Amino acid sequence: MRLPIEKRHVWEAYQAVRLNDGTHGADMEDWVAFDRRRYHNLFRIWNRVSSGAYFPKPVRRVFLRKDDGGERPLGIPCIRDRIVQEVLRGVLEPYLEPHFHDSSFAYRPGRNAHQGIAQCRTNTDYYSWCIDLDIRGYFDNIPHDKLMQAVVHFC
C-alpha cells in the first residue's frame, strides 16, 4: 500500500522541526538559508517524497564527550532530511503504533521513561528474575531489509 504524502504533512513537519531549531547538517544549510526559499524548499520536499524520488544527504558526524572520557558519535541530518523524517513519522505512526507492545515506552507518543519505570516495578510483583542487557551499537546494526518488510506488512 502506498501512503499518500500531502502538502499539509510537509508543512506540519516543517513547523515541528523548526521549533527545535537545531544546527546544520553536512550540507551546511542553516535555517536562515532554508527559510529564504522556504515555500520552494517545502514544495521540492513534497514533490520528491510523494513521487518516491527523495534521497537523503550524508549525515554530519560529531562526537560528544562522555563522562568516562570516551566519545559518543552523533549523526546530524540536514534540515531537509529532518523534515522528511518528521513527515514519515507523522504518516506512518498511526498505522504502526497499534502494533507495538503495551510494555514498550521508548519514542512513543504519550509514553515516557517514568511510565517504563512504573511498568518495571509492576513486573517485579509477578517475576522473581530480571534480564539486564545492552546491545552495543544496536541502532547502527538493525537489518534494514527486515525492518522495511515489517513496515510494508503493517502499512
Predicted regions and their residues:
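Non-catalytic terminal/accessory segments
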Residues: 1-155
